[in-house]
Amino acid sequence: MAFASITFIAASRRRAVLLLPLLLASLPAAAHSELRRSVPAAGAVLMQAPEQMELHFNERVQLTALRLYRDGSEEISLPRRAIRSATTEIIALPPLPPGAYRAEWRIISADGHPAGGVIPFRIEAPKRP
């Protein structure tokens, strides 16, 4: 009986060793491009309008779209990118009045996967004394 148990355990281990590479190969890659930080930051409340928007990624990306909306629906026209590096995009912004904003971005990562996100922020009207 002990011999049968040992044989069964050995056979199970062999199957596990043979199946493990197949299981690992079928898992999706976990390390995709991600936005590390932005200026303005998501959820920021600003007392003055930013002059530029910065997107900092964890790896080389290609920015395919950046759209800025004010108060939910009004799209703000953005100029071409001001500065670009492998992992950073800096975009000059036009003068922005107070209000709620939403920046929507899309990228293609170095491994070809698309990704995107939303950065909401708010510009407050200056306080009057």
Predicted regions located by residue number:
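Short strand-edge motifs at loop-to-beta-strand transitions and within beta-strands
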Residues: T87-I91
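N-terminal edge beta-strand
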Residues: A31-A49
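Short proline/glycine-enriched turn/loop motifs at strand-loop junctions of beta-rich domains
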Residues: N58-L63
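N-terminal export leaders
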Residues: R15-L22
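A glycine-anchored, Pro-Gly-centered beta-turn/N-cap motif
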Residues: A92, P97-A103
